[in-house]
Curated annotation (Swiss-Prot):
Positions of IMP binding: D13, E14, G15, K16, N38, A39, G40, H41, T132, R146, Q226, T241, R305
Gene Ontology cellular component list: cytoplasm
InterPro entries linked: Adenylosuccin_syn_GTP-bd, Adenylosuccin_syn_Lys_AS, Adenylosuccinate_synth_dom1, Adenylosuccinate_synth_dom2, Adenylosuccinate_synth_dom3, Adenylosuccinate_synthetase, P-loop_NTPase
Job description of the protein: Plays an important role in the de novo pathway of purine nucleotide biosynthesis. Catalyzes the first committed step in the biosynthesis of AMP from IMP.
Active-site residue list: D13, H41
Enzyme class: ligase
Keyword Lyase: no
Positions of Mg(2+) binding: D13, G40
Cell location: Cytoplasm
Name by which UniProt lists this protein: Adenylosuccinate synthetase
GO molecular function: adenylosuccinate synthase activity; GTP binding; magnesium ion binding
Gene3D superfamilies tied to this protein: Adenylosuccinate Synthetase, subunit A, domain 1, Adenylosuccinate Synthetase, subunit A, domain 2, Adenylosuccinate Synthetase, subunit A, domain 3
Length: 432
């Protein structure tokens, strides 16, 4: 038996939600370890769609414990709203199936406002990052700046006013510089006290809880929220998220040691998508890109934003295999490629007349690279709902094998529709 870390190997939206749900049936505990409510995922269970953005996927399955780790930034209002929405769908969330790390940072209204103000200012100067405006980045800034309000602070009303003063000293200075009204101390105090009773019952010393469960033999599934190429260090900086999204963060963001992580499963879409700004070497702005977007329903769960689409970039995924230590991949949305006469895979780039095998870290160089493609024959037959290799056309199998060879990692699972059971299992990541 081993634990499993699920990471996205591209820019997010790889189909992690379905795979995590599929794996959660084999897990006892599902842990979110980074990000906030800026990355959504959709689960389809018995014909019912559940759209989650903060809660771990395991929360919709009976008998599973969901954990929000210390690496997550928690908007308490978003947490309460998501719990209430699930209640309306018949899913009851209590401390018996959800724990929130007491040392997790809270997202406040002033974080959301600052996020939006910065994006608006950047839009006017052409330097927009393309955030979801949900306050994720500013909350992480306060965490690193050692002025954040954390979940545990909601239980200590004696020391909370001083902590609010500290965070407002910083934020009101920023607001004065931006020419907007300052936030009053009472506004933030009221905001925090209004959610305390709803949030505090879920708080726990998560590292201790997970350590006890690990020693007891529980199977733990770590759920990443965004793709590796959005990692603050290893992604396409500055067009990245504000946290580490690679597999190593599963340890830091949950309080478990790296030796407890086990199998690293990279969720990998059979083509490439990206939301928002930033480099995208294989982007297709033609009818094929439109075809992929429409057939793949490439619209953001959280924002509704249309995703940019392009050919599979093996060079980028190969980089993710290295930075995450990926053991195997779950290849998703192969069925979206059905019907295309030919398919292209990027195997490297040309940069200023030189051939390179990875995307450079420099923003300027990233904008200048040109993809080097190989071309494969497509297939006319449908792969939708395939549950064994025998159900796949020969050219589809050839495409999968080519992907494995180019990225240097085997396919452990192959997803052929949004339905959980439409999955070909090659290797069970939870097996010893």
């Amino acid at each position: 038996m081993t634990n499993v870390v699920v990471v996205g190997s591209q820019w997010g939206d790889e189909g992690k939600g379905k795979i995590v749900d599929w794996l959660s049936e084999r897990a006892d505990i599902v842990v979110r370890y980074q990000g906030g409510h800026n990355a959504g995922h959709t689960l389809v269970i018995d014909g019912t769609s559940y759209k989650l953005s903060l809660l771990p996927s395991g929360v919709v399955r009976p008998g599973k414990m969901a954990v929000i780790g210390n690496g997550v930034v928690v908007d308490p209002h978003a947490l309460i709203a998501e719990i209430e929405k699930l209640a309306g769908q018949g899913v009851t969330i209590t401390p018996d199936n959800l724990r929130v790390a007491d040392n997790a940072t809270l997202i406040l209204s002033l974080h959301r406002e600052l996020d939006a103000m910065r994006e608006d200012a950047a839009s006017n100067s052409g330097t927009k990052i393309g955030t979801t405006r949900r306050g994720i980045g500013p909350a992480y800034e306060d965490k690193v700046g050692r002025r954040a309000i954390r979940v545990m602070d909601l239980a200590d009303l004696d020391s909370l006013p001083g902590k609010v003063d500290r965070i407002l000293t910083h934020h009101n200075a920023l607001r004065r510089g931006l020419g907007v009204a300052e936030v009053s101390h009472q506004t933030i105090m009221d905001e925090l006290t209004s959610v305390a009773e709803r949030v505090l019952p879920f708080r726990d010393t998560v590292w201790l809880f997970l350590d006890k469960e690990r020693r007891r033999g529980a199977r733990i599934l770590f759920e990443g929220a965004q793709g590796s190429l959005l990692d603050i260090d290893h992604g396409t900086y500055p067009f990245v998220t504000s946290s580490n999204t690679v597999a190593g963060q599963a340890a830091a963001g949950s309080g478990m040691g790296p030796g407890s992580l086990g199998y690293i499963l990279g969720i990998t879409k059979a083509y490439t998508t990206r939301v928002g700004e930033g480099p995208f070497p294989t982007e297709l702005k033609d009818e094929i890109g439109e075809f992929l977007g429409q057939k793949g329903h490439e619209f953001g769960v959280v924002t509704g934003r249309k995703r940019r689409c392009g050919w599979f970039d093996a060079a980028l995924v190969r980089q993710s295999v290295a930075t995450n230590g990926i053991t195997g991949i779950a290849l998703t949305k192969l069925d979206v490629l059905d019907g295309l006469e030919e398919l292209k895979i990027c195997v490297g780039y040309m940069l200023d007349g030189e051939q390179i095998d990875h995307l450079p870290a420099s923003q300027g160089a990233q904008a200048r690279v040109e993809p080097i493609y190989i071309t494969l024959e497509g297939w006319k037959e449908s792969t939708v709902g395939a549950r064994s290799w025998a159900d796949l056309p020969a050219q589809a199998i050839k495409y999968v094998r080519q992907v494995e060879e180019l990225i240097g990692a085997p396919v452990a699972l192959l997803s052929t529709s949004p339905e959980r059971d439409d999955t070909i299992l090659v290797t069970d990541p939870f097996e010893d």
